[in-house]
Amino acid sequence: MAIDFRSPDGFDAILAVCIERKKALVSGTTGLSALQFEGMKTAGVLIPILWASNFSLGVAVLNQLVSQAGQWLKHWNIDITEAHHIHKIDAPSGTALSLGQTVKQASGLDPNYHSLRCGDVVGEHTVQFTSQGERLELTHRATNRDIFAQGALFAAEKISTKPNGFYQFADLL
């Protein structure tokens, strides 16, 4: 079993080692190229692979709620606002982009993204649906980074009992 959160530059090497040794892979690496994603999905034929942009149970639930809201409110404006600490490099974050993919799949709309880098914020994501006279906001706030490690260990435990395939965090819930 390998758990990998490195940069995209190291991803291909760890995937190759897992395939060679027939070991499961849990990856939280964001910023992967389309080619790397395809390689990961293809490798799912050979080993169990789980990829997630975020290993928080709360974000997994948020994603499901966003999917439902996106189906019902597809004629509303949709914005995703995310905030992280000042040292976070990618903007928008991988989690914001994943939420955006959920919005697109559910509603057919591309959301607007707004990224903040401030202080020591662990991670906040809000998906806002707005229409004339009303607004629905779905928000998740991480206040402690331990939740991500706990989620990765949960994923590793669950994926170890799964057959070969490509999985996402929500598939384990």
Locate predicted features.
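N-terminal Rossmann-like NAD(P) cofactor-binding module of classical short-chain dehydrogenase/reductase
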Residues: 2-3
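Residues at the start of alpha-helices and the adjacent loop-to-helix junctions
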Residues: 6, 10, 144-147
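Short loop or secondary-structure boundary microenvironments that flank
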Residues: 7, 29-30, 55, 85, ...
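Rossmann-fold NAD(P)-binding glycine/threonine-rich loop
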Residues: 9-21, 27-51, 57-69
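Short N-terminal helix-initiation segments at or just after the protein's N-terminus
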Residues: 25-27, 76-77
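Short, surface-exposed loop/turn motifs that are enriched in glycine and acidic residues
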Residues: 51-59, 85-92
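C-terminal substrate-binding/catalytic lobe of Rossmann-fold NAD(P)-dependent oxidoreductases
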Residues: 74-173
